[in-house]
Amino acid sequence: MSKVLEAKQSAVEEIKTKLSASASTVIVDYRGLNVGEITELRKQLRDAGIEFKVYKNSLTRRAVEANGYEGLEGALTGPNAIAFSNEDVVAPAKILNDFAKDHEALEIKAGVIEGKVASLEEIKALATLPSREGLLSMLCNVLQAPVRGLAIATKAVADQKEGQEA
């Protein structure tokens, strides 16, 4: 087998593995961004633990078909880059959406969220959600509210009794 064919097959395997292992994958069109802007975007994504890579569309298409993600083929035209996140589902969508607001040249096309193909609208909706840590802190606040209310009521009763004794 030729070295070129082996390299292409290993690239398809790499994409397949990353697609199946990632919690969130977002495909973007980076046409129109200059080198400085792409470097800035890569740094933001890297700091969040997200891999951002450019693959040939034909190789990506083969990996997408092998993983059974129907509906992504339409997004695989033109110059594309793919952001893979193995841990945080929201982070790639949030970072790319925020970057796209400041840089109109970046266009979010589609993605895969926890094994399901997601449209542009779904990715933008995901980007507006708070991060996992933010959601957990909201949940803690909701769970603490009744306990806090009980503690305040108990303290008020104790203060009232002290006031009556004095």
From Swiss-Prot:
SUPFAM superfamilies: Ribosomal protein L10-like. It comes from the Bacteria. Pfam families: Ribosomal_L10 (PF00466). One of its GO terms (molecular function) is structural constituent of ribosome. GO terms for biological process: translation. Keywords: Ribonucleoprotein, Ribosomal protein, RNA-binding, rRNA-binding. The keyword Oxidoreductase does not apply. GO terms for cellular component: large ribosomal subunit. CDD domains: Ribosomal_L10. Gene3D superfamilies: 3.30.70.1730. PROSITE patterns: RIBOSOMAL_L10 (PS01109). Part of the ribosomal stalk of the 50S ribosomal subunit. The N-terminus interacts with L11 and the large rRNA to form the base of the stalk. The C-terminus forms an elongated spine to which L12 dimers bind in a sequential fashion forming a multimeric L10(L12)X complex. NCBIfam families: PRK00099.1-1. Belongs to the universal ribosomal protein uL10 family. Forms part of the ribosomal stalk, playing a central role in the interaction of the ribosome with GTP-bound translation factors. This is Large ribosomal subunit protein uL10. It comes from Listeria welshimeri serovar 6b (strain ATCC 35897 / DSM 20650 / CCUG 15529 / CIP 8149 / NCTC 11857 / SLCC 5334 / V8).
